């Protein structure tokens, strides 16, 4: 019995220990919710401790006599790392909690839930450990100084401090020798560089000298050399006898022995450091150079390919700065003033220069009437606001003056015709410029577009235009820069009626003008004007924007006295249903836009406008005919897409007579027209956008598309064809040959809907620059790219290299997008809805843009649960970024 007892005791212990182990591991799963809550609570405590330490450091480092201890910095870095890990962990907590079952005591995937639960426990322990280490008796120590001249500056706000920290970290990186700071005038570049200068006085003796030089537009090499020499102890009478090269040698001999920082403020062109005598900063010598400029091009010429943009302030940051300038007493003098002050601050659009000047001007205004008047002036004629011309517009004008040539300046000023904060389509803007004669249309469409985009790029890099972040095809103008452009257009305010811009201000009638003969440009777009009756002598008028109004009728007299009108835009006047015959008197007209109007018949006089090169008749739902268009023999761009207009053989013949035509957009809804039009190589080369609609199977069983090198956008809707084939040329000898080179080299957007006979879209292999693909409501589509057909065409073509967005809607038969995983180096969004048979996406863990999220939207929650991922790594890569979203139809 004794022997048995001695054996049973160790067995009990083993069982007990094994049970405890199972309980511990089981707790990773069934205590997951509780453990996550504990982790979140511990993280809040750690953040609070981090905040206390940072606040102590800011107080002690403020004097510039203290620097933080290394152990404190190590602890802060560890906290940042654990915070990032915590955020990553938290992103997938909903998925993990949904995976639990049996009231949280089990999981649909024990392995994944166990791993996640264990990570939660391990992180909880690490957070608690870091929190306990965050008690410091001392956080900083005394530090020596570099040779720095501190420069006074006005108090700054949180947003500017964040920008400072970012710039400082970039400059102080070991591999960084030179930092470029660029941004529009008045955005705070000099303030930022000043704070960088002063910060060097608070760090240790890593640098021997910090040199500040104001360069400006008129600076010379000699002037820069003199400023540097004064700082390093050179100069004297003998310098007047030396040339620039000899002085450069002297400066170089001094600086090569010292670890220096050179800060160059306000440079307008490349500063040749070698010519000045400054050793080029490198990792080896440990020296630093930072500069500010208004032009990103200058950054490139200085050898900085990744400069830091100094941006306008966010709305709340703008309000903080504006409050600081106006003062608490003024803001508190009447309960309505803070609300009005916010409206005034918004007019500045985050530009610190404007916030400072306007804030100071309003600091003594303590009545509601004064604030309301300020809003009225800033809205209707900002140039009349106190300080606007002298302190803001003159400062910004330096950027305009620095533009190279009158062409660039004219193109810039043209952008001020659009309303405040208006998104301007780049290609549409270039079409205006071509029609105005800024760009010579005889150079050909491709050259014109390239030149136009080069001008836009230059203006963006000069911070005079802003490129839209989401949609790179749009630009806009900062409101204060727009005021500067309007001021310049009016000869610096001397001829305010030379360029009349009242866009988007709620006008109901054409404004009164003292002398119409002096008016060159008028923009009344985005208003509520209904009738245009007046007739005026507009001998100098070249541009008239009336788009996006409520115009119902235009009198016959209106067009009689505009002999030099070149651009007329009447688009998006949806109540406009007729035009007077007197349109024929606009003999100089080159650009005419009637899109989105309800005009049912074009006046015969329109066909007499022989100078017309751009005619837009898109989305005209009532237009019946354009017979006679061949009389516009100089026409180069013609928009017909989405109009009620029927494209028949007689119209095709007229289009073939337009010898100068370069761009056309149209709809094809008849097989009788499709074949002859697609056999006309000259017309095919002009097609930029085309929609095939209502082509029935009995008439077009196979749609054969020729090479369309200029095609940008393609729609195929409600068609019955069974297959789409591609031919490389339009000649009959090659009609059935498979293409070996891209046939749609510029095609970027494809829409296919309600084509119930199609089985696949393998022809998309020959659209290498496709960025957007939407396929919907086509019940027989089984493959986007058929593996079998793809091998027949070319085994070497990899599809969708440029694809950014993929939408798949109600494709009940869709089984595959592609047979194997693709790299998708540009893909950002996949949206799948009502595609029940699609079980696998062509993704692996390396698909998508490196370091960026690829969002998968799905319409049915059960679909995402059935997706078969390539492997676990792929699932972990994409499942957390999958989101339910029902498509609005």
Swiss-Prot record:
GO terms for cellular component: plasma membrane. Its main location: membrane. A lipid is attached at residue 4 (S-palmitoyl cysteine). InterPro entries: Apaf_helical, LRR_dom_sf, LRR_R13L4/SHOC2-like, NB-ARC, P-loop_NTPase, Plant_NBS-LRR, WH-like_DNA-bd_sf. Residues 140-444 form the NB-ARC domain. LRR repeats lie at residues 518-539, 540-561, 564-586, 588-610, 611-633, 634-656. Pfam families: LRR_14, NB-ARC, WH_DRP. It comes from the Eukaryota. Keywords: ATP-binding, Cell membrane, Coiled coil, Hypersensitive response, Leucine-rich repeat, Lipoprotein, Membrane, Myristate, Nucleotide-binding, Palmitate, Plant defense, Repeat. It is found in: Cell membrane. GO terms for molecular function: ADP binding; ATP binding; identical protein binding; nucleotide binding; signaling receptor activity. ATP binds at residues 183-190. A lipid is attached at residue 2 (N-myristoyl glycine). It is a lipid-anchor. One of its GO terms (biological process) is defense response to bacterium. Residues 29-58 form a coiled coil. RPS5 is absent in cv. Landsberg erecta. The LRR repeats probably act as specificity determinant of pathogen recognition. Belongs to the disease resistance NB-LRR family. Disease resistance (R) protein that specifically recognizes the avrPphB type III effector avirulence protein from Pseudomonas syringae. Also confers resistance against Hyaloperonospora parasitica (downy mildew). Resistance proteins guard the plant against pathogens that contain an appropriate avirulence protein via an indirect interaction with this avirulence protein. That triggers a defense system including the hypersensitive response, which restricts the pathogen growth. Requires PBS1 to trigger the defense reaction against avrPphB. In uninfected plants, interacts with PBS1 through the coiled coil domain. Homodimer. This is Disease resistance protein RPS5.
């Amino acid at each position: 019995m004794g022997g048995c007892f001695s054996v049973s005791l160790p067995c009990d212990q083993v069982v007990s220990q094994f049970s405890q182990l199972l309980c511990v591991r089981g707790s990773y799963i069934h205590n997951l919710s509780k453990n996550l809550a504990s982790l979140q609570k511990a993280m809040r405590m750690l953040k609070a401790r981090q905040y206390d330490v940072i606040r102590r450091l800011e107080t002690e480092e403020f004097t510039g006599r203290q620097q933080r201890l290394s152990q404190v910095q190590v602890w802060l870095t560890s906290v940042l790392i654990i915070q990032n890990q915590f955020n990553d962990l938290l992103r997938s907590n909903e998925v993990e909690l949904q995976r639990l079952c049996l009231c949280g005591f089990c999981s649909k995937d024990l392995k994944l839930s166990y791993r996640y639960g264990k990570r939660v426990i391990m992180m909880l322990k690490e957070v608690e450990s870091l929190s306990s280490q965050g008690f410091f008796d001392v956080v900083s120590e005394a530090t020596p100084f570099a040779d720095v001249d501190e420069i006074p500056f006005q108090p700054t706000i949180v947003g500017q401090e964040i920008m400072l920290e970012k710039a400082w970290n970039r400059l102080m990186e070991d591999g960084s020798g030179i930092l470029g700071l660029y941004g529009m005038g008045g955005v705070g570049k000099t303030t930022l560089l000043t704070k960088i200068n002063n910060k060097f006085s608070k760090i240790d003796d890593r640098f021997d000298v910090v040199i500040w030089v104001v360069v400006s537009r008129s600076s010379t090499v000699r002037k820069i050399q003199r400023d540097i020499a004064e700082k390093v102890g050179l100069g004297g009478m003998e310098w007047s006898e030396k040339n620039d090269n000899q002085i450069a040698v002297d400066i170089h001999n001094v600086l090569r022995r010292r670890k220096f920082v050179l800060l160059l403020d306000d440079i307008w062109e490349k500063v040749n450091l070698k010519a000045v005598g400054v050793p080029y900063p490198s990792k080896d010598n440990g020296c630093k150079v930072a500069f500010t400029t208004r032009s990103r091009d200058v950054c490139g010429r200085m050898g900085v390919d990744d400069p830091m943009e100094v941006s306008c302030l966010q709305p709340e940051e703008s309000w903080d700065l504006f409050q600081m300038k106006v003062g608490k007493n003024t803001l508190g003098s009447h309960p309505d003033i803070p609300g009005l002050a916010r409206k005034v601050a918004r007019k500045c659009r985050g530009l610190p220069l404007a916030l400072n000047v306007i804030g100071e001007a309003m600091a003594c205004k303590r009545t509601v009437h004064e604030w309301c008047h300020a809003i009225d002036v800033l809205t209707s004629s900002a140039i009349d606001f106190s300080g606007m011309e002298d302190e803001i517009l003159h400062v910004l004008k330096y950027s305009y003056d620095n533009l190279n040539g009158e062409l660039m300046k004219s193109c810039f000023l043209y952008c001020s015709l659009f309303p405040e904060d208006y998104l301007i389509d780049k290609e549409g803007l270039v079409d205006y410029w071509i029609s105005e004669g800024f760009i010579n249309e005889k150079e050909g469409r491709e050259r014109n577009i390239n030149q136009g985009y080069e001008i836009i790029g230059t203006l963006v890099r000069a911070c005079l235009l802003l490129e839209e972040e989401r949609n790179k095809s749009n630009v806009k103008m900062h409101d204060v820069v727009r005021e500067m452009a309007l001021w310049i257009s009016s000869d610096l305010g001397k001829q305010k009626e030379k360029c009349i811009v009242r866009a988007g201000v709620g006008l109901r009638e054409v404004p009164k003008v003292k002398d119409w003969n002096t008016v060159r440009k008028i923009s009344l777009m985005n208003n509520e004007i209904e009738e245009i009756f007046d007739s005026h002598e507009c001998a100098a008028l070249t541009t008239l924007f009336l788009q996006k109004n409520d115009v119902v009728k235009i009198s016959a007299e209106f067009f009689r006295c505009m002999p030099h009108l070149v651009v007329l835009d009447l688009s998006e006047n949806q109540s406009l249903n007729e035009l007077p015959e007197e349109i024929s008197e606009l003999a100089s007209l080159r650009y005419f836009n009637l899109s989105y109007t309800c005009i049912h018949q074009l006046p015969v006089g329109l066909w007499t406008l022989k100078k017309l090169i751009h005619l837009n008749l898109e989305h005209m739902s009532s237009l019946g005919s354009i017979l006679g268009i061949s009389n516009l023999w100089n026409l180069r761009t013609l928009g017909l897409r989405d109009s009620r207009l029927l494209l028949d053989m007689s119209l095709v013949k007229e289009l073939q007579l337009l010898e100068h035509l370069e761009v056309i957009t149209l709809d094809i809804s008849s097989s009788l027209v499709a074949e002859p039009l697609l056999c006309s190589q000259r017309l095919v080369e002009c097609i930029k956008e085309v929609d095939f609609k209502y082509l029935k199977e009995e008439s077009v069983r196979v749609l054969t598309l020729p090479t369309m090198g200029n095609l940008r956008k393609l729609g195929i809707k409600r068609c019955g064809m069974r297959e789409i084939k591609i031919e490389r040329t339009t000649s009959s000898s090659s009609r059935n040959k498979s293409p070996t080179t891209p046939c749609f080299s510029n095609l970027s957007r494809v829409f296919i809907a309600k084509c119930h006979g199609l089985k696949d879209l393998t022809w998309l292999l020959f659209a290498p620059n496709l960025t957007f693909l939407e396929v919907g409501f086509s019940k027989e589509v089984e493959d986007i790219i058929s593996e079998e057909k793809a091998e027949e065409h070319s085994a070497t073509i990899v599809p969708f290299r440029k694809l950014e967005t993929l939408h798949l809607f109600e494709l009940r038969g869709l089984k595959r997008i592609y047979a194997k995983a693709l790299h998708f180096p540009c893909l950002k969004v996949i949206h799948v809805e009502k595609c029940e048979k699609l079980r696998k996406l062509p993704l692996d863990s390396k698909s998508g843009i490196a370091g960026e999220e690829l969002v998968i939207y799905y319409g049915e929650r059960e679909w995402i649960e059935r997706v078969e991922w390539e492997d676990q790594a792929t699932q972990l890569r994409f499942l957390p970024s999958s989101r339910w979203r029902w498509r609005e139809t």
